[in-house]
Amino acid sequence: LHEQKVTRVFAISFSFSFGLLITGTSWVYVSLHNFGGMHPVLAVIATVFLSAIFALPPAIIQTALAKLVSSPSRRMLIVFPVGLALSDWCRGWFLTGFPWLSIGYSQIPLSPLSNYAPLLGIYGVTLACAFCSGGVGYLFTYLSVNRANPKWKVGVILPTLILFLSIVLGSVRWTEKISQSAT
């Protein structure tokens, strides 16, 4: 979303969300066609329509944030991560739309970012992942444009801090065993 026009931000965000949703909702087609007896073409149309409807809010959120923030670096470091986490949260809570497709679940259980889950929940993991992605994107963008500009270091520092804090959080015992279970 770096240095993109607002209309292009909408198209990119919608395409990403639609791609995520269409792959995560293939079971809707199976339910409609195999179990509901719906004609295959109509089942495909219904699944595509459902995915497109659920892809609109993330695209609208990212577009609105991009309109508010014109700085390309702030878009990468703040707008993209906040917009991604906010749209995941909105889809999961307000639209009852497949919360298991949240980006944060891609980090559970093996990523160090999963250490944010006990404290911030899955949407906090999504936010941490998005901030790391924004930082890495920022790093590569600045390195490809102007290596002499020291601003590229932000792209290293942000993900490093997030990962370091995650490792620290991983050393905390969030629960403790009270007693042995009889079963």
Where are these regions (language model features)?
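Membrane-embedded alpha-helical bundles of multi-pass enzymes
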Residues: 1-179
